[in-house]
Amino acid sequence: MKLPPELEFHDDLHLLIYRPRGVIDEAAVKKVVDVLEDLEAKLQKPFDRFSDTLGADEVELNFKYVIQVSLCRRLSYLGHPPVKSAILAADATMIHYARLHALLTQGSPIHVRIFKDRKEAADWLAVPLERLTTDREQTEAG
């Protein structure tokens, strides 16, 4: 399955990584949800998610849309094994919508946490930190 450039799947880690650039809007979210649902159907095994929103320039969403997507994800994933969804965010608007998503998926197999620190997200997901960093970040750190 060919993924859009902002998405990468690490089969060895059972992890889908989303790195949006530019604007996060309804079209961007819909594209990610479509890929997510396709992978869930194709793989038939649970995988965690990591959303690195630090590269996004702007968030153009609204409460109604976030509620709709969160509730749809909650219902569509009902009865599946638990998965973790880590959201790395610094933007106040993104954090606000991520918290709403976490609240609405509470009690479902989708466990959402929001992080400001990449290492904490890596620890929670139980994956090596370097797998969550971009090539540019690795170059700057090295």
What is the meaning of each model-derived region?
Residues M1-G142:
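Amphipathic, Lys/Arg-enriched alpha-helical "gate/interface" segment within cytosolic domains
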